[in-house]
Amino acid sequence: MSDDKNQIKIKFTTNESDESLKVEETPLYVPVTLKRYGLSEIVNHLLETQKALESESGEDDEERKPVPFNFLINGELLRTSISDYLTRNGLSSEAFLTIEYTRAILPPSFQASFQNDDWISSLDSINRNLSAVTSSQLTITNPKILSGSYDGIVKTYNMSGKVEKQYMGHSAAVKSVKWISPTRIVSCGNDQQVRLWKTAYEGVVDQNEEDEEENEANEGDDGDNDMEKIEDGKTLAILEGHKAPVVDLAVNQQTKRILSAGYDLNVGFWSTNYKDMAKISIPEYDSNVISTSSKKRRKLALQDATIRRRSPLSLLLGHTEPVEGVIFDELDATVGYSVSQDHTIKTWDLVTLRCVDTRTTGFSLLSILQLPQVNLIATGSSARHINLHDPRVSASNTNSEVVNTKLVGHTNFVVGLSASPHNSNMFASSSHDGTVKVWDIRADKSLYTITREDGSTKSKIFGVCWDSEIGLISGGEDKRVQINKGSDISK
């Protein structure tokens, strides 16, 4: 049978942790014409045979449902027939292939969408398993969605689409929002400000955080009376230092630090605790200017007149064009990364506050994401593609171009990236082409493309967030928070 050119010798292997999905790694011959579906049938048949043997021995008699699988050869997802793979890689049917199988990625279907009053620029989520919760003193039951909007308002949505809280203080478009803890959030916007907010979560207050503020209130800091009952959406502090719009944020709960991306060419470095930062005098507002401002701006200016101000721990200067994205290294909190319209990715030592590596690409970079388990940095560009970089490979000089892989599929700017919470090889991207795409770094094309509920791609998508409980959350010009989810989408 091994001489039959229509057959090839293979063996299956898997890294699935579920023991019930593992088959014996015994060599067998299969037709070279098989694709994913045919191979999936074979694996399920082998699993069913094993199940039958276990049932005869009295070990397990529970009925097993077929499981769809994806297949990898030499780390590459099989998207064609085995024959096409052999031809493309210059192999013959005499080869002996080891084929890895994993749970298939099923199409993410539309679940819900929530109406907002203006364009949605940024999204974040919180659930019981995220570090924003596990690093706090609170336990939570229900996941929430945080949104930032072009009307300057930050909102918290529950899973029914109800707006539970509003955070009003920004005088221009909000560009990024992040959870710090269940009772703390941070936002930034075109008004050049970073704002720390406090609130209750499902009626519960983090007593540790409240005790800190009580102690400071007793010391007479800023003359604020923080002994009062907590209010939804109260600005805890305004963080000032940027001289242009602030468009992205990153939070590290371990070190209690924040990074911000500014159009003033700076990367801001802040603390989640305002007591760690130097005070700034509260400005005296010109009554003549205030009186001629819009009603909204006048009200916000008067409110801000009593709010404490803080300066950054540091402003990291090195980019030559506006900074678009910032992240902390998930494996080393003393390292940060930033991307800019100057085409570069910079690596920052957050202890010495110095840039330690610069790598140059060919296009403006608009978003950044780390995939720590596979040692890659993904960047979205103005050239419509996504680049994958290995941060361990140092650029030989400041002008060198280091790109590992280029993922092509979007037809406009790639402005948002979010990692899969389950699969270290997967992430999602949002684009001005009106779509969200799901990617696996082992495939050269996107796995799925998500449009809006009505199938439209006319509205730009700005924000994307992939939550383990909620699913894929996206928002943009259509003023809707949309949720898509597929069974085992990334398992």
Swiss-Prot record:
GO terms for cellular component: nucleoplasm; PeBoW complex; preribosome, large subunit precursor. It holds the Pfam family WD40. PROSITE patterns: WD_REPEATS_2 (PS50082), WD_REPEATS_REGION (PS50294). Residues 113-491 are annotated as: Sufficient for interaction with ERB1 and association with 66S pre-ribosomes. Residues 207-225 have a biased composition (Acidic residues). Residues 8-103 are annotated as: Ubiquitin-like (UBL) domain. Disulfide bonds: none annotated. GO terms for molecular function: ribonucleoprotein complex binding. WD repeats lie at residues 128-167, 169-207, 241-280, 318-358, 360-399, 409-449, 456-491. CDD domains: WD40. InterPro entries: G-protein_beta_WD-40_rep, NLE, WD40/YVTN_repeat-like_dom_sf, WD40_repeat_dom_sf, WD40_rpt, WDR12/Ytm1. Belongs to the WD repeat WDR12/YTM1 family. Component of the NOP7 complex, which is required for maturation of the 25S and 5.8S ribosomal RNAs and formation of the 60S ribosome. This is Ribosome biogenesis protein YTM1. It comes from Lodderomyces elongisporus (strain ATCC 11503 / CBS 2605 / JCM 1781 / NBRC 1676 / NRRL YB-4239) (Yeast). The gene is YTM1.
